[in-house]
Amino acid sequence: MLKTYITTVPLQGKLDPMLYQRDHVTPPVATCFPIVQVMRDTLEPGDTVQLLAIRQENADTARNYQRLLEELAQLGIAEHQVRQIDLPEDQHPETLIGLCRNLVDALPQVTRVYACITYGSKSIPVVTLTALTCAEATHTELEVGGVYYGEVKRENGQVLSARLYDMAALYQLSGLVGTMRDSRTAEQVFHQLIWMNEHRED
C-alpha cells in the first residue's frame, strides 16, 4: 500500500528529541519529529512511502530538514521519497490557498494519508485539513489514516511528558457535519462519530 505522510519542517532553532507516547502502540523511540513516530507505528512490510514536507526557505528550516532526512534514513526512507512543498513567509489568503492546492496536487490519487499538524504557523493545520477534505472528495481512492498533534508539557523549562494525539475524530466530525440534514440531530452525529472512532483501523 502507498502511504503518504505530511509534516511541516519547524522554524525552531533547537529541536530536542522526545519520546512521544501513544495509546495501544509499541514503545516510542526518541525523535524530533512526531511524524517519524507515526511512521514507526503505521508502516508495514511491503508499504511504499512518500513524505510531503512543508517548509519555508531559511537557515533554521534547512538545518531541521537535514535532521528530518537523517531520522528518515534510520527508517530506510531515502531523500528521493521526500517531496518539499514550498511555503512563502507571508500569510495572505491567496498564499495559503496556493499551499492548499499544492498539497492536494502532490497527494497521489490512491493512498492512505497521515498528517502531522504539530509544527508550523497557526494557519498550517487549517490548510492541511482543508487539503485533506478536498483530496478525499476529488481523488480516486484516498483515505485519511490519521491526523496527529505532538504535545510536550513543560514545567520550569523541564519536559514533563510528550504525547502524540490522533485528531482524526475531529476531522471526521467536520465531514459528518457536512452531511447533516433535518432528520439528523447533533446527538446522532456525535454518536456516529464515537462509533467510528472506536472502530477505525490504524
Residue ranges: model-predicted function:
Residues M1-R112, T133-D202:
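Long, low-complexity, Lys/Arg-enriched
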Residues K122-E136:
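Short Gly/Thr/Asp-enriched flexible loops that form oxyanion-binding sites at enzyme active sites
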Residues A115:
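Detector for conserved single-position "signature" residues within domains
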